[in-house]
Amino acid sequence: MAESIQSLDQLSQLKGAVTAPDAPKYEKKVDKFGRAYATGKRKDAVARVWIKPGSGKVTVNTRDIEVYFARPVLRMMIEQPMVVAARKGQYDVICTVAGGGLSGQAGAVRHGLSKALTNFEPELRSVLKKGGFLTRDSRVVERKKYGKAKARRSFQFSKR
């Protein structure tokens, strides 16, 4: 093949003829019960999320979402991936979440729900990725240092 190329023009023509590899194809991942599963994490919280086609009922640790997450902001945060993907009310969501506080748990459920949606409908991946729902939020609490009152706050200083 190298012998057949005589000039740079022929090389550029050959380069154009070679096709670029296609984007990776994502498959639908569903268990025998027709549910998609994913794990989401945020701070110290870990959420295990299952989704299946249904009426839009969201259950967190065997309790309704309104009972478990009383603050409307947290509920809105969890429902964001469904709203962005235009799938609100089409899937039943069952999740178990442990560790951390309510804000971290809501973030973990949101992350897991986004991943489960992409497992159920791979074509939603680009929409959710663009919205930043598939990216793990890696921010965690900064550790306390010795010689300091907290992570960065110093002890009170007295000149005299």
Curated annotation (Swiss-Prot):
Keyword ATP-binding attributed: no
What single Pfam family name could you report for this chain, choosing any that match?
Ribosomal_S9
* GO cellular component annotations of the record: cytosolic small ribosomal subunit
Q: Provide this UniProt record's keywords sorted from A to Z.
A: Ribonucleoprotein, Ribosomal protein
The molecular function terms in GO held by this entry are:
RNA binding; structural constituent of ribosome
Q: Which InterPro entries match?
A: Ribosomal_Su5_D2-typ_SF, Ribosomal_uS9, Ribosomal_uS9_bac/plastid, Ribosomal_uS9_CS, Ribsml_uS5_D2-typ_fold_subgr
UniProt cross-references to PROSITE patterns, sorted A to Z: RIBOSOMAL_S9
Q: Which residues cross the membrane?
A: none
Instruction: List the HAMAP family.
Output: Ribosomal_uS9_B (MF_00532_B)
Q: Which family does it belong to?
A: Belongs to the universal ribosomal protein uS9 family.
Q: What is this protein called?
A: Small ribosomal subunit protein uS9
Source species: Bradyrhizobium sp. (strain ORS 278)
What's the gene? rpsI
